[in-house]
Design a protein with these regions (language model features):
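Nucleotidyltransferase catalytic core that binds NTPs
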Residues: 1-192
Length: 192
């Protein structure tokens, strides 16, 4: 993947300046940052994001969404149960606290309840609306210099299962390609 190092250096400097500015405004008190999501199937991309986030705050909070598919039909149902995702997140050293929520309204209430300084978002949210975008938080957009995404990870698991399981391949070959997600696997399209 091509990486524009000058862009990355500028972005890193901006993030550092945001942290210093908030620290001075808070008169030396801790800077609290947060992110929100369902964090299904923890992978190296998440841990890289959490590590980067922690560099820009004293305390890093994760708001964990139970099941985004229950309110947004564009989202997939999580594979890992809610409480298991909570336990995994709590075991990551860059995360200080995890709070669970079910709806975007609950997330908004959490964001209003806590004294939060910085919101951590992926750069794919640049220019897009998001829950709480009208609140008074600085926003730091993290780069996705890694190639990881949950959808790609799930597709990779499906592909490897298909490749390594002859019985499954035979079963899928009898299914109408447009009737199931199998057409992507049969065509070798394992990416999102």
């Amino acid at each position: 993947m091509y990486m524009d190092f000058e862009y990355q250096r500028t972005l890193d400097q901006h993030k550092s300046n945001v942290y210093k500015k908030i620290k001075s405004v808070n008169l030396g008190k801790e800077v609290v940052a947060f992110t929100a999501g369902n964090f299904d199937i923890i992978h190296p991309g998440y841990t890289a994001t959490f590590e980067e986030a922690k560099r820009h705050c004293d305390k890093f909070i994760v708001f964990l969404h139970g099941d985004p598919s229950s309110t947004r039909n564009t989202k997939y149902k999580p594979v890992v149960p809610y409480y298991d995702r909570y336990k995994m997140l709590m075991s990551i050293r860059h995360i200080d606290e995890v709070y669970m929520y079910q709806t975007e309204e609950e997330l908004l209430e959490l964001m209003k309840t806590f004294k939060l300084d910085v919101r951590i978002l992926g750069e794919d949210y640049l220019g897009k609306p998001f829950t709480g975008d009208d609140l008074e938080h600085e926003v730091i957009y993290t780069t996705r210099s890694h190639e990881w995404s949950t959808t790609k990870f799930k597709n990779r698991i499906a592909a490897m299962t298909f490749i390594q399981n002859e019985d499954l391949r035979e079963t899928l070959e009898g299914i109408e390609p447009d009737s199931w997600y199998a057409n992507r696997i049969l065509e070798g399209n394992f990416e999102a």
